[in-house]
From Swiss-Prot:
GO annotation (BP), single: fatty acid elongation
Pathway: Lipid metabolism; fatty acid biosynthesis
Organism of derivation: Malassezia globosa (strain ATCC MYA-4612 / CBS 7966)
Name of the protein: Very-long-chain 3-oxoacyl-CoA reductase
GO cellular component: endoplasmic reticulum membrane
Length: 324
């Protein structure tokens, strides 16, 4: 009798595990995300759709968000530091996607104060903003022990990754609430989820975004504004310093395509509210590490990787110094 019960329990456990893995696979690869027409995109009649505001819009992931949201029928508000790059982006969008309207706002998030945020508010006050992509971010120049970190770099990372993100959201979110439907995407990082020694300040700023996004998401849910943190591993970009794409390191174009097709899902972030790990290989890594890898071991491995990265960065800097 006992043996029969144990067999049943074991069988139920195995079937449950298999069913769970199948569900994860469906979540990562099959189940569609929410259509962007929910938020006012109009791909058939360009220019008639609502607006999407993207920060850090002139390079990498931010640029791809601006381009792909425009391709899906949103007009674009591009916000970044360099006016010349913004003008080039705006011209490219309007020339390659006739009918789409753009405007841009040059803003240095490191030094922005009340006047700059008020200027942004004035720019968008009469626009039907439906989507906000908080993409702008800053990391360390190289991995560094926290006690050896330059105080100015510490302040800069917190200013851009935390303060600027909240300030832009404070300006834009009321537009989403008033229209009765909207979307806020915050660019997160695996570093915030699992932490990364020698990148402690960056990791801490991204961990803040996890908690803040979840709290904001629950608040905004009642106003029919969807809020999601896009959990991100390495992507080819100047910030990651990775130049060659691979199965685990997508190009910005492929990453953004995955993100925009999975809105409203969790993918590899199952069970974590208001969080989406959109790129398939990242999603499986997220799920596997969360379920099978001890945090203490992960921290030690991350420390070793960061230390090796720091040593290589120092050697590169020394070679450049000698060549000058």
């Amino acid at each position: 009798m006992i043996e029969t019960c144990l067999c049943w329990v074991g069988g139920i456990f195995i079937v449950t595990c298999i069913a769970y893995v199948v569900y994860v696979a469906l979540e990562v690869h099959v189940f569609p995300g929410r259509s962007l027409t929910t938020y006012g995109a109009n791909p058939k009649l360009r220019g008639a759709g609502s607006w999407a505001l993207v920060t850090g819009a002139t390079d990498g992931i931010g640029r791809e968000f601006a381009m792909q949201l425009a391709a899906r029928g949103f007009n674009i508000v591009a916000v970044s530091r360099t006016a010349e790059k913004l003008a080039i982006l705006s011209k490219e969008i309007e020339s390659t996607m006739p009918g789409i309207k753009t405007c841009y706002y040059a803003m240095d998030f490191l030094s922005a104060g009340n006047a700059e945020y008020e200027g942004l508010e004035q720019l968008i006050r009469h626009l039907d903003i439906a989507v906000l992509v908080n993409n702008v971010g800053l990391s360390h120049t190289m991995p560094v022990n926290f006690l050896e970190m330059d105080g100015r770099e510490l302040a800069s990372i917190c200013q851009v990754n935390i303060v600027a993100t909240m300030q832009v959201t404070r300006v834009v979110a009321p537009h989403l609430v008033r229209r009765g439907r909207g979307l806020i995407l915050n660019l997160g990082s695996f570093s915030g989820q699992w932490s990364t020694p020698l990148l402690a300040t960056y990791a801490g700023s991204k961990a803040f975004l996890i908690a803040w996004t979840q709290a904001l998401g629950e608040e905004m849910r009642r106003s029919h504004v969807d809020v999601q943190l896009l959990n991100t591993y390495f992507v080819v970009s100047s910030m990651s310093k990775v130049r060659k794409p691979s199965m685990m390191v997508p190009t910005p174009k492929n990453f953004v395509r995955s993100a925009l097709s999975r809105i409203g899902r969790s993918s590899g972030a199952l069970g974590r509210p208001f969080t989406l790990t959109p790129f398939p290989s990242h999603a499986w890594l997220d799920w596997a590490v969360e379920h099978f890898v001890p945090r203490w071991w992960l921290l030690r491995q991350a420390y070793d990787v960061s230390l090796d990265t720091r040593r290589r960065a120092i050697r590169k800097a020394q070679r450049l110094e000698k060549s000058q």
